[in-house]
Amino acid sequence: MSTGTSSTTAKNRIRVIILGAAGRDFHDFNTFWRKDPRYEVVTFTAAQIPDIEGRTYPAELCGDNYPNGIPIEPEEKLVELIHKYEVDQVAMAYSDLSHEEVMHKAAIVNAAGADFRIMGHKHTMISSKKPVIAVCAVRTGCGKSQTSRAVTGILKGIGKRVAAIRHPMPYGNLIAQNV
């Protein structure tokens, strides 16, 4: 039975689940949630990457607010996780879902008692004083990496200095991939 009060921790932090696909969710965490003392990210969920459930986003990448890292749990347990962790907000961190899929997830989250939010670029974009070329696609596997390598090669070929960045992906050792 709901009391109508927030289920925040004793420190009055807003408890958050980041709903994602093991990519943008890590990026959103690193750029917005990681250092913000108002929020406590209690878990990531995953649905698109095989065998990622049960892993932990490493403490070494989480910062001081998360000395034990953050667990990655199966998205199909979302409602259970909202109740288990007494979650206040679920933040959508997918980039490749249809409107129907997004709103279905929002309805599930709201029915379980949590707020649903989608982060905009204002809070998650990495700032740069240099010109930027962004390589984006609608789905995983569309060729972003190959396209990025080709663009990098062209720019280097005309004498430009190039730096390529991407959000963390859960393939291999995330700590070793840190820059």
Functional labels for PLM-detected ranges:
Residues F29-D36, A106-I108, V151, V179:
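Short, solvent-exposed amphipathic alpha-helical segments in soluble enzyme
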Residues P58-K122:
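Phosphate-bearing ligand-interacting subdomains
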Residues A134-V151:
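Glycine-rich phosphate-binding P-loop
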Residues I154-V179:
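ATP-dependent carboxylate-amine ligase catalytic core
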Residues R15-L19, A134, A163-I165:
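Conserved beta-strand elements of the Class I
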Residues N12-V87:
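A solvent-exposed beta-alpha-beta segment
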Residues T124-K130:
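Phosphate-binding P-loop
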